[in-house]
């Protein structure tokens, strides 16, 4: 991902920052939106105490954590709540689907024996898809975007620290820079992901889906936001 480019006006990082800090964090449209979705899920009176951009979420024993675009933590009448936010304009969910990532990881392992990427992909596929990474081929329903899988893994492990609920909103900002063709491709990648991971609809109005992993209830939604930059 070109982080410098994403901090440009109208791109994901810059737009996310504006959305959650204008006029200030507490009164921002971003916080209002997250509250709205938690309330729709029955978590009444949500209030937030912590927020951090580029928040590291370790999810396995290897060195590189999942870097969340924004993490927000708080309380509700039903208990603690957590949101791990992924921001997009029309940027891809990474450059690789799983079979591409795994093929490259195996090649890297030969060149760099200390590389752990092959092990990481194998463990993620086994844990969350219940298939071997080796078995995933081009065109398979499990051949999802690698970025989305480690977004899920990092968010679950973040919730395991203290909470048992995590909301994963993918916030798509339709700025002046938004490209519909690229946006449609991202939506297809998201739809493939929720199908492969067997998320089930739990709120039709907000298009929120749910699946429980261990003791963590995971909610996910694809939220499109018109934004004038």
PLM feature spans:
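Charged, often low-complexity linker/regulatory segments
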Residues: 1-33
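Active-site metal-binding core of divalent-cation-utilizing nuclease and nuclease-like domains
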Residues: 43-77, 91
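Beta-propeller domains
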Residues: 63-67, 140-144, 225-227
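Conserved catalytic cores of phosphodiester-cleaving nucleases, focusing on short active-site segments
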Residues: 70-72, 81-89, 151
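Non-catalytic C-terminal interaction segments of nucleic acid-processing enzymes
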Residues: 147-229
């Amino acid at each position: 991902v070109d982080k410098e480019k994403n901090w440009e006006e109208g791109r994901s990082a810059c737009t996310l920052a504006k959305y959650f800090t204008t006029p200030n964090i507490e009164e921002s449209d971003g916080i209002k939106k997250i509250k709205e979705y938690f309330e729709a899920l029955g978590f009444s009176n949500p209030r937030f105490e912590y927020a951090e951009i580029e928040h590291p979420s370790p999810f396995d024993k290897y060195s590189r954590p999942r870097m969340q675009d924004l993490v927000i933590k708080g309380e509700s009448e039903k208990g603690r709540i957590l949101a791990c936010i992924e921001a997009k304009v029309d940027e891809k969910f990474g450059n690789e689907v799983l079979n591409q990532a795994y093929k490259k990881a195996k090649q890297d392992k030969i060149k760099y024996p200390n590389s752990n990427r092959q092990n990481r992909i194998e463990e993620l596929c086994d844990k969350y898809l219940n298939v071997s990474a080796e078995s995933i081929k081009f065109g398979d329903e499990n051949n999802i975007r690698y970025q989305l899988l480690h977004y899920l893994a990092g968010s679950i492990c973040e919730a395991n620290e203290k909470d048992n609920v995590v909301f994963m909103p993918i916030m798509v900002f339709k700025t002046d820079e938004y490209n519909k063709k690229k946006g449609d491709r991202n939506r297809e990648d998201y739809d493939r992901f929720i199908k492969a991971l067997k998320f089930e609809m739990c709120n039709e109005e907000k298009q929120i889906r749910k699946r429980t992993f261990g003791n963590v209830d995971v909610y996910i939604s694809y939220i499109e936001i018109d934004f004038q930059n």
